[in-house]
């Protein structure tokens, strides 16, 4: 069962208007969507996105004229909304990462805790599986992926072990990969007992395969463009790589962060960063002790909120 993280907090952060138009960019199993719908009036509207065909299938169970589900990535949100004749929205929620159901379903291949085919695709209807990618990736590229997206100190040793194992037998299951990685980590160092040795490597491969950080980076500017004045951007992230992108973007748009000196930027980027388009609302929010006790996977969640300003104002540098 998928338990939505920061459920009430996210809905509160959207500051929902009864007649507003809202987007749940990651439907999952609809926990956030259902609460948003409960707070909308008869003329309100909610549009949900998800790359996962199983999530879209679950969305069909919502029989509500105010609700519409779109199978696709939130990276194409502007184009998708245009096709629905929606040019502006009053709020958008991005609940990033992989869902509990995806982790717990062995056939999806996301988790080292359940043996299954090494898949890891958010959209199981397209693209390479993790097994297919591992069969062709070079040791150098694999090391870079694990180091960059997993922040794994033993990236080089793990990449070498995976490539070596691949020459002996194709790596096609989650347990195969987990055992290879765990053996390396246990050999070269110690890891927090609460975290499985393969956690960072699985995260890295999943992020790379699904282009999660690239999609987030191209989505955030679209969100700002689509928001009406006083509309809210609410983002829940689950690891430092995501949160760093969200934090930096919001600070840039709020005029509280500057471009690094000597960084080459296009004129349009310089103009964008010189105008204040967002106001950051409050501090980052984390799940409380009770929520973490009931749902341990919520422990790493961080929610950030920003509001679209009436007009972009000049920021003095």
Swiss-Prot record:
**Entry superkingdom:** Bacteria
Protein function? Specifically methylates the N4 position of cytidine in position 1402 (C1402) of 16S rRNA.
The subcellular localization recorded is: Cytoplasm
Identify the enzyme class: transferase
Q: Any idea of its EC number?
A: 2.1.1.199
Write down any Gene Ontology CC term. Answer: cytoplasm
Biological process according to GO:
rRNA base methylation
Q: Which reaction does it catalyse?
A: cytidine(1402) in 16S rRNA + S-adenosyl-L-methionine = N(4)-methylcytidine(1402) in 16S rRNA + S-adenosyl-L-homocysteine + H(+)
InterPro entries, per database record: RsmH (IPR002903), SAM-dep_MeTrfase_MraW_recog (IPR023397), SAM-dependent_MTases_sf (IPR029063)
Q: What is this protein called?
A: Ribosomal RNA small subunit methyltransferase H
> Which gene is the coding source of this polypeptide chain?
rsmH
What start-end ranges are recorded for coiled-coil regions in this protein?
A: none
Q: Which GO terms describe its molecular function?
A: rRNA (cytosine-N4-)-methyltransferase activity
| Keywords, comma-separated and alphabetical | Cytoplasm, Methyltransferase, rRNA processing, S-adenosyl-L-methionine, Transferase
Tell me the residue numbers annotated for binding S-adenosyl-L-methionine: 30-32, 50, 74, 95, 102
Does the keyword S-adenosyl-L-methionine feature in the UniProt annotation?
yes
Q: What is its main location?
A: cytoplasm
Q: What Pfam family is a match, any one?
A: Methyltransf_5
- To which protein family does this belong? Belongs to the methyltransferase superfamily. RsmH family.
């Amino acid at each position: 069962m998928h338990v939505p993280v920061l459920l009430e907090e996210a809905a509160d952060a959207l500051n929902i208007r009864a007649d507003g138009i809202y987007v749940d960019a990651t439907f999952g199993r609809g926990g956030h969507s259902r609460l948003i719908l409960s707070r909308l009036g008869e003329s309100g509207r909610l549009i949900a996105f998800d790359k996962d065909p199983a999530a879209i299938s679950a969305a069909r169970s919502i029989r509500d004229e105010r609700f519409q589900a779109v199978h696709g990535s939130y990276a194409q949100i502007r184009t998708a909304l245009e096709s629905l004749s929606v040019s502006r929205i009053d709020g958008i929620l991005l609940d990033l990462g992989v869902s509990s159901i995806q982790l717990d379903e062995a056939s999806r291949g996301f988790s080292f805790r359940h043996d299954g085919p090494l898949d890891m695709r958010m959209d199981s209807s397209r693209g390479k599986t993790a097994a297919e990618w591992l069969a062709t990736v070079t040791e150098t590229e694999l090391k870079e992926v694990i180091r960059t997206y997993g922040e794994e100190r033993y990236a080089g040793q793990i990449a070498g072990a995976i490539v070596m194992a691949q020459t002996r037998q194709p790596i096609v299951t989650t347990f195969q990969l987990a055992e290879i990685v765990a053996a390396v980590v246990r050999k070269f160092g110690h890891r927090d007992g609460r975290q499985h040795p393969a956690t960072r490597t699985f995260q890295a491969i999943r992020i790379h395969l699904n282009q999660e950080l690239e999609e987030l980076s191209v989505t955030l500017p679209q969100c700002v463009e689509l928001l009406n004045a006083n509309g809210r951007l609410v983002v829940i992230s689950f690891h430092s790589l995501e949160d760093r992108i969200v934090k930096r973007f919001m600070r840039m748009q709020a005029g509280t962060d500057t471009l690094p000196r000597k960084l080459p930027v296009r004129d349009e980027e310089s103009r964008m960063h010189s105008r204040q388009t967002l106001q950051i609302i409050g501090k980052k929010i984390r799940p409380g002790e009770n929520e973490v006790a009931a749902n341990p996977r919520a422990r790493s969640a961080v929610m950030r909120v920003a509001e679209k300003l009436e007009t972009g104002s000049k920021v003095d540098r």
